[in-house]
């Protein structure tokens, strides 16, 4: 039975195709349209489907929508409609207002008919947003039982769900409703500090430069820890649904930062305090989960689960022995969760498919790649061992675009759509930030490390699979040897690389290790202010306009591109 899951209501639109419980394909719409997050979250566009991602999934399986038995959407329109009953600071016709929520609901309801027009003849399902997040975390995990925490901005009316999983059953045991939302708190602080609502990674990177002390008490006025793992937020100050930072300005005694203004020590201190209270809240939730559910396994999803600093705290806290985090923890992952919920809860499917990697996106043949090389006027050669060639270039301080195999599903580049560099040189970080990626200097870079050497280079008390997906931060043992991948706080957000899961990438890092004595490389996403590259054409276009030294694409090494 083919089951398709789709996420389309807000942002990070995506599709995932499952066959008899096995994940066949999953991709985000942004990778095809080249528009970050696919679309903004608005009340007037929830019916816009990820048609390119759907088309890719079907093509990968060699089927059409007529062959799909079930489609699940990761939203419950009726429950979401009740948002206008929540007292809030809203703009008429927008989120939270009766007119806005009615528009959102009515347009959502057109989705089944749209799918019918595309050829779908099976059964359609509306599904709980946070239950889809939870399903995406538990069903691909290696556990037979687990506590599951899903935390983000908002789903229908909730921001956080705690669930208990056993076998193929996944049961919600509690929710925390809006406006108690860690995800929205991060969005609000990000915009207050002059970034966009999608810039949580920038805020997290900046936090390491600050001291939480000066502003921690200010956040304590905003946030209260409550019994049973709950928490509350003062939306009278935050005003999540209004373009209004006056409450935060009064609280912090600091005017909102304009995007062009300098980032100051006060801004860094505010982000450090935000990170500290996020750690407190998530530890509070996880402690309750451990004590109430009686399991030593924890699964996580939702945008908050992309916070590698908090994940490092949770991993070291001791409440759980094993941690699994869905690599597509953001809303795109709910497409996967929707498909798996239908397979297990509706169809009663017993088979589970452990998700040990995230390589479910498009891949391209050597013929596809060489056609693109010729079309772009590339200066290239075919090499016998691309991994060895790339390792030698990295050891010579070159920056290499690395395009191999199937694209990753999720926001992290995990060795198939990556920019690689030598971690030993501090100048590498500055060059990548300023000349290649065109981003802020305070943002760190991550290392990909051979799994068999990870504990020699990082303080990993309890290994967890989340490190395979670059989702946990650990303290570096030898920061002076790898300064380009160690943040100012002495930690690194590592990706552990296994030979059996990505042999070509493992061989590259092994080659670099033999040359330099360092079993890791700098790995950042292959993009420049746009979505991660998907196709050979995307890779060549980014290579041409960026200051990347070489492009290793399939078995081909590209030195230059002369035309588009």
Set out the residue ranges of the language-model regions.
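Adenine-nucleotide phosphate-binding core of ATP-dependent small-molecule kinases
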Residues: 259-285
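Short beta-strand-loop/turn "lid" adjacent to the catalytic site in phosphate-handling enzymes
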Residues: 56-112, 135-136
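Structural motif corresponding to the C-terminal cap of alpha-helices
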Residues: 58-61, 138, 278-281, 285-293
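Short HxH-centered metal-ligating active-site micro-motif
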Residues: 45-60, 71-75, 508, 516-518
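N-terminal phosphate-binding loop and adjacent alpha-helix
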Residues: 32-63, 282
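Flexible beta->alpha loop and helix N-cap segments adjacent to enzyme active/binding sites
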Residues: 2, 7-36, 42-45, 87, ...
